[in-house]
Amino acid sequence: MALLLSYPRRHPSIHLLILSAYALFLLPILDGLELGGDGLYREILRDETVLRLKELGKISDGEGYLERTFLSPASIRASAVIISWMKDAGLTTWIDQMGNIHGRFEPTNSTKEALLIGSHMDTVIDAGMYDGALGIISAISALKVLKVTGRLQRLTRPVEVIAFSDEEGVRFQTTFLGSAAVAGTLPESILQVSDKSGTTVQDVLKLNSLEGTANALGEVRYSPESVGSYVEVHIEQGPVLEALRYPLGVVKGIAGQTRLKVIINGSQGHAGTVPMKLRRDPMVAAAELVLTLETLCKEPNKFLTYDEECGCFTEESLAGLVCTVGELLTWPSASNVIPGQVNFTVDIRAMDDKVRETIVTSFSRLVLQRCDDRLVDCAVEQKHAAAATPCDAELTSRLERATRSTISSMAAGVRRAGGETPVLMSGAGHDAMAMARLTKVGMLFVRCRGGVSHSPEESVMDDDVWAAGLALVNFIDQNAVDAAAATAAES
């Protein structure tokens, strides 16, 4: 009414017309903004999702930085919050024997296989707030939209959101604990793997009131017959979408990955009394090997004989090869002591499994050669290996259609004029790799600023968060909602 009072005095009938126009046009617009009547559900898919991302990002074991590892105190607090959000979306919730959080809607009398949507709740050390969390919260928000619009009850197949307890592998140096357990590929021996403090996986499970037995581990496994597909939303962790000025992209496959641990033992001694020529210094050997790895992965043709080693290397197969030394530890780690032992990690990734396997073999051979030259003892342990994972073509096509529908319906500021939805390869490992052993998988990437990830500088625009959630709503609508019932209800 304040707006009407500012107008010149008019005949009462004019005021009635204005009020009628207000009621007919302005109120539905306001209602649409509040309840999603515009079909875009901004308040749930953008505003509430971003607030929840920030809330989860504050739950940390670190002081002043984000760290949330497998079943840590912060992980337990985060689980309680995620469960409350799942219940808010109308889902039935539970925690399995590997600490994964599940939220599921089960249609009455449905015999169809479930659609699983998930990502991981753990983080690296000094992490950003989007890696993993975005996939979980976007999925919960999408199902909340279905709940508030009455479409949740029209689902024709079960839809389940899973927040996996561990993907990064920070605490136990073994990735995909959560998703591999669900896929049924986690060996019983994992229970005896220990962290840096000597605490085993079994110890941690029992400390958190879980059984920590082989039988309990088997209970986590889903049967392939009960699952139709798995979909994961994740930040790109690369710069391609930003360069293309596009908020979303579909993933055609995930690079294979191998993690190694190199252990070098030399002669510990006094930094001032042992002559240089008489030293057996593992630090120098480690430094040389780090540079050797860099050269091997930058210029593999200098080390590999194509015909003998593989017979299949091409410019394309070698293009996605990347190698990283991310951790180096020395003992006793004192400034005036020649180290007695140096350990470092190696991460090797490639789109072509033959390339990756050959690089692993070649580097392991070079480690032994360099250590012999330096008169130090060494060993190479393989800690993790995962084959490249292709995404299901039909699932990818459906995600692409949902993405295209999303982008065309959003505001002009979110769209890039023309062009098709980008199709990307992922150089990073994801829970979808483990879940591919259970069912067909698909992935949706979300643009992140500068391609930065595993860093507090990780950043995603609010509207891109919105786009990801809306794409999931559209995907679920197209693949799990009774279209005939939905049309009848809306009419």
UniProtKB/Swiss-Prot annotation:
Cofactor descriptive note: Binds 2 manganese ions per subunit.
Major location (coarse): endoplasmic reticulum
Enzyme class (EC, first level): hydrolase
Pfam families the record matches: M20_dimer, Peptidase_M20
Protein residues bound to Mn(2+) 2: D131, E168, H454
Domain of life per record: Eukaryota
Gene3D superfamilies: 3.30.70.360, Zn peptidases
EC number in record: 3.5.3.9
Protein name in UniProt: Probable allantoate deiminase
